[in-house]
């Protein structure tokens, strides 16, 4: 067998076709009746569900490719490719509770080629979604259900359905709604409770779910929504967290897509570990006190994840090719939580982490009828340093609230970079602007709000009633030989005044208030999570075997 043929066989083996085998019938109907009775008795449906209304509400249908969209301005040549953003879009209304993290993953994609734009939106065809389509209704528990005794009951309902083979959990139960990344010829849709789903971008910009990626059965645990690709080695670094030991498992995936042996990371308890970071020689794990506490859920009527403000924040720095965690160095900093890191690198004896640091997180803030608020919500850009020689740790505040979704020119991942691009939050879930930080400049003392000056080099304000999403940096030229900020920021925008959505492109160097391009979209695009840009070269190199 020739080398090309061997490679094609390997690719076919690595993508798993998802064909769950749920079961309708008397057993399924009986379980449904029990659930309906308990929901009727114990769930308060009178409270409106904020995250199913307004522009959080799901769109009813997928959108096949809509070509030749109206473009104001021009789309630069470096944007030839597919801009994609994923987010929650529940296909079926929930039986009871609903948390913003619960919805089925829908990818909104814009194919750009030769100055023209095509829009499409498609569900990530997860095992969970396929089964609920089969039943024509929800059958899997939701984060929004997991409070109090009612939460315990909903957990038991899912376990019962699985035991009776009403639902098939053999392919996982994730939604694919959180983030996207490209590695070894594959665009991956991610949610941290599941394995990656492979999504193919078709020539016309359409999106097709090919199946699950289990790395030839070497991946048996969950997979973070925020793996890291080293642009200098083309390797991908990832981990999964669990509610039973080992609570964290670290993995390295070669540039050829081969997953190496698991490395269990020892931490004292089950925590939510949403992100991590890599440098040239290290991986950084974050043991932060947002604990998985089912007992507290039942006793205190709390959400199943609860934050302990009395505990320190711990950061573990591990040589990134370590065979076990015996060489990990743990550092402590004041109590906090972190959803998203920007980058990390090494300076002498120190490992430097640039991150968005959050105080007193409460996942209930984006749950059910709870409207988003900014009171007591402190999410700020920070620099953290870990001295590998002395064991000392320090941190420095780089901004006031509220900043999130930090992105960089990803050609600099693992290396020291100068600029960070983030979103300015009007409230917990709405983005009112895009901000550019210069890490070579000092923050202005005494600032009470985010404004240009000091280390804030530019702000793109979306205007009243207009809200955006994570902005992705696209360089004019890939690599680190050109100017770091020579490129564009691309992101989705929704105008609540008109009900219309669009894609904006702005100049990352100047942060001019005048967009380089505005692409008018045919449909509303709900607020969502993370975005990614697949360049033309990556599109042409997609591994397409099923």
Swiss-Prot record:
Tissues showing expression: In vegetative and floral tissues.
Entry cofactors: Fe(2+)
BP terms from Gene Ontology: carotene catabolic process
Predominant location: cytoplasm
Catalytic activity: all-trans-zeaxanthin + 2 O2 = 4,9-dimethyldodeca-2,4,6,8,10-pentaenedial + 2 (3R)-hydroxy-beta-ionone
Molecular function via GO: carotenoid dioxygenase activity; metal ion binding
Induction data: Constitutively expressed at low level in all tissues.
EC number of the protein: 1.14.99.n4
Cofactor binding, per record: Binds 1 Fe(2+) ion per subunit.
Subcellular location: Cytoplasm
Record's GO cellular component terms: chloroplast stroma
Superkingdom, natural source: Eukaryota
Role according to the record: Cleaves a variety of carotenoids symmetrically at both the 9-10 and 9'-10' double bonds. Catalyzes the formation of 4,9-dimethyldodeca-2,4,6,8,10-pentaene-1,12-dialdehyde and probably hydroxydihydro-beta-ionone from zeaxanthin.
Family (UniProt): Belongs to the carotenoid oxygenase family.
UniProt name for this protein: Carotenoid 9,10(9',10')-cleavage dioxygenase
Organism the protein comes from: Crocus sativus
């Amino acid at each position: 067998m020739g080398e090309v043929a061997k490679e094609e066989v390997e690719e076919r083996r690595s993508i798993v076709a998802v064909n769950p085998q749920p079961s309708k019938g008397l057993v399924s109907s009986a379980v449904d009746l029990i659930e309906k009775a308990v929901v009727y008795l114990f769930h308060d449906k009178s409270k409106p569900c904020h995250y199913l209304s307004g522009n959080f509400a799901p769109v009813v249908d997928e959108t096949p490719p809509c070509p030749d969209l109206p473009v104001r301005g021009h789309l630069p040549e470096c944007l030839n490719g597919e801009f994609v953003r994923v987010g929650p879009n529940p296909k079926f209304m929930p039986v009871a509770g609903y948390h913003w993290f619960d919805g089925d993953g829908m990818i909104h994609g814009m194919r750009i080629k030769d100055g023209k734009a095509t829009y499409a939106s498609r569900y990530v065809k997860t095992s969970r979604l396929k089964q609920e389509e089969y039943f024509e209704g929800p059958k899997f528990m939701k984060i929004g259900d997991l409070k109090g005794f009612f939460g315990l009951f909903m957990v038991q309902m899912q376990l019962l359905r699985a035991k009776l083979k009403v639902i098939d959990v053999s392919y996982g139960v994730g939604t694919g709604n959180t983030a996207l990344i490209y590695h070894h010829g594959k665009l991956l849709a991610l949610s941290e409770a599941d394995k990656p789903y492979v999504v193919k971008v078709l020539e016309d910009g359409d999106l097709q779910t090919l199946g699950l990626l289990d790395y030839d059965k070497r991946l048996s645990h969950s997979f973070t929504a925020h793996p890291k690709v080293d642009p200098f080695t083309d390797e991908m670094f990832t981990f999964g967290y669990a509610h039973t030991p080992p609570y964290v498992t670290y993995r390295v995936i070669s540039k050829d897509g081969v997953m190496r042996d698991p490395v269990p990371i020892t931490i004292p308890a089950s925590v939510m570990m949403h992100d991590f970071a890599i440098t040239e020689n290290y991986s950084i794990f974050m043991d932060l006190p947002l604990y998985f506490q089912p007992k507290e859920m039942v006793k205190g009527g709390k959400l199943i994840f609860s934050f302990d403000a009395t505990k320190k924040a711990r950061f573990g720095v591990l040589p990134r090719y370590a065979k076990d965690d015996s060489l990990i160095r743990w550092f402590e900093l004041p109590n906090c939580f972190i959803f998203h890191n920007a980058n990390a690198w090494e300076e002498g004896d120190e490992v430097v982490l640039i991150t968005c640091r959050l105080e007193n997180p409460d996942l209930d803030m984006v749950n059910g009828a709870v409207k988003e608020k900014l009171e007591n919500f402190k999410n700020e850009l920070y620099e953290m340093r870990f001295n590998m020689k002395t064991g000392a740790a320090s941190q420095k505040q780089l901004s006031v609230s509220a900043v999130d979704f930090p992105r960089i020119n990803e050609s600099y991942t693992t290396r020291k970079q100068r600029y960070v691009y983030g979103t300015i939050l009007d409230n917990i879930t709405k983005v009112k602007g895009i901000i550019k930080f210069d890490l070579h400049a000092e923050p202005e003392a005494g600032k009470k709000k985010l404004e240009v000056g000091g280390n804030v080099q530019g702000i793109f304000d979306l205007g009243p009633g207009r809200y955006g999403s994570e902005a992705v940096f696209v360089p004019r030229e890939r690599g680190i030989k050109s100017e770091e900020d020579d490129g564009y920021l691309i992101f989705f925008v929704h105008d609540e005044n008109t009900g219309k959505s669009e894609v904006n492109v702005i100049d990352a160097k100047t942060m001019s208030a005048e967009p380089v391009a505005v692409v008018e979209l045919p449909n509303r695009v709900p607020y969502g999570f993370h975005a990614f840009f697949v360049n033309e070269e990556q599109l042409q190199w997609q591994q397409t075997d099923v």
